[in-house]
Amino acid sequence: MIAITPEQTALIPIYREKWRQIGLSIAPIDRPQATAAINTAYNIIGYPEPEIIFCDSPYIALQAIEPLRIRDSGLGMASEIRNKIHNELYDILRSQLGRQLENKIYSQLYNPLYAQLMNQLHLHVKDEVYVKLAKKLGGRFQRFLIDQAYHNNSIVSELSACHGSWVDFCIGVLNLEYDRPLYSAFKSLVENCGWIYPFEQKCFVCDRPIQLHFDSEYLLHAEGQAAIEFADKLSV
């Protein structure tokens, strides 16, 4: 197992900030690059390239997904992608880290990013999306919610950015061995896509927010306006 030097440890905040910026990007996604990222992911898991539907927000995507049936879009592919690309990549890197070093990297890279990207941004957006869907779907919402929870068919860009921080650090600073095609596919997904809802025949790719506002403590906050806003006016 490897050891980490003080000089390498000093780079942790730089990688944390790098991936915070990626996770909080408000730049519109580049659709050709996003398309290439999705097609590469499907190729890796052995499936044909899907029809890709771009959506201004997760709310728009879930509205489109709700009435679909398996015959319309195929089975959910998120677990296939996570297992083949994300988890295999993580396992290769973890196998070279001792438990103590892994915990140190997680506590200083992954955990702080998770607190901001997932506990703030992701959960705020998810809660608002479900509130709006509940109003729109009425009696169908509870069944849809259960179906979403059961299938868990999404790849969340904020969570991928949290993982990207320690993966990037392990490769770029610790020089661990890794699978280049898997890392390239992983990095392309997180850098070029927002939330992803992948099915066998169709893949819904959400754009990023167009506005994010934070206070001096990096907490979501805005006076007199939404702290988070998407192009379709979904806002929190």
Model-derived features: positions:
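Short, glycine-biased loop/turn motifs at secondary-structure junctions and
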Residues: 1-236
